[in-house]
């Protein structure tokens, strides 16, 4: 199976080349763990290769996303790519008549997309009138987006587990969690792969996840 590079060379190596092509990956974690930056880094990796990429934000505005990226050396080219191979779509939560189905319809207005990031899945629950309805429409959305041939990352704030508590981890092909851990009384970020269909990986082994002035990278340290 062909692979899609993640934007983190060491993570690509651990996963045998990257995420399996045309899969849905849930990236969960608490506030400040790096979910948004992980998603944008994934898109910039593809956009630089000429792949069509779209970041769908239910939180920050496009201006806020760009400002966050420009704080890191390896992500400063974000503005040059917008309007060419990268789009940032902001969907306001107060928008009337919004539903997950209409949400997907908005995405179909773009030319064929190779990579999509949706941030934040927790907010999508507001588009449904029940938990059951959300699960059904969420599953339908994933099937549709995979069917058109795109690789999808969904960012989500975890609810004490590895997803938001509405079964998203079950529906997605892969699950990565970002978190803060204490190592010798020093707080550090970590990345853990909990699930990844069609690929071998170190199951549930936390790896050091570094965010510095240069950008994002996976460290050599395994946190055991």
Regions found by a protein language model. Name each.
Residues 1-8, 109-111, 208-224:
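NTP-binding/hydrolysis catalytic cores, primarily Walker-type P-loop NTPases
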Residues 6-18:
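Pre-Walker A adenine-sensing motif
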Residues 25, 30-95:
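Conserved P-loop
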Residues 49-52, 84, 149-150, 171-174, ...:
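Short glycine-/polar-rich loops that comprise or flank the Walker A/P-loop
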Residues 55, 152-154:
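Structural beta-sheet core signal
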Residues 89-150:
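Phosphate-binding/switch loop-helix module in NTP-utilizing enzymes
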Residues 154-214, 224:
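Phosphate-binding/switch region of NTP-binding enzymes
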